[in-house]
Amino acid sequence: MKLGRLNHIGVATPSIAESVTYYREVMGAVDVSEPFDMPEQGVKVCFVDTPGPDGGAGTQIELIEPLSEASPIHGFLVKDPLGGQHHVCFEVPDIAAARAWFEGLGKRILGPTRIGAHGTPIFFLHPKDMMGVLTEIMETPRGDALDGH
């Protein structure tokens, strides 16, 4: 199994609105999605693309704000009130094959495979099995899912 490209970096934030201002004013981001709720995961999400060197899209940042105190992101923000890097996300061509491969390696998978913010199947790997980094594995978007939200 070979991982594909880095799709995005997830950043927990107490305020998507304040974070968007930061990414626009400090990082020069111009491509910002409309925030949307994912109640099944207890979060509000917004995608920000930093500009690339050629003027195209650079790195995509997924801003994640808790919808309530029951959200896992709320717990993250209790420890780190200003927010910060939450996870990295890599693409794979086949999510079921990737899951089986990581399970075969003895890596702990956090919960079932589910549909993520880009509209494609995802799962998360425990940071203790991934060199201290919470890692999201995402099936490479196809068709309508390419645009995300």
Model-derived features: positions:
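Basic/polar N-terminal segments that are highly enriched at the extreme N-terminus
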Residues: 1, 144-149
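Short beta-strand-to-coil "C-cap" segments at the C-terminal boundary of structured domains/repeats
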Residues: 138-143
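Short loop/beta submotifs within extracellular cysteine-rich repeat domains
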Residues: 19, 30-31, 55-59, 70-72, ...
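Vicinal oxygen chelate
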Residues: 6-14, 46-59, 67-68, 73-97, ...
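Core segments of cupin and vicinal oxygen chelate
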Residues: 1, 11-58, 97-120, 125
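Short, tandemly repeated low-complexity microdomains enriched for cysteine and small residues
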Residues: 34-37, 72-79, 116, 147-149
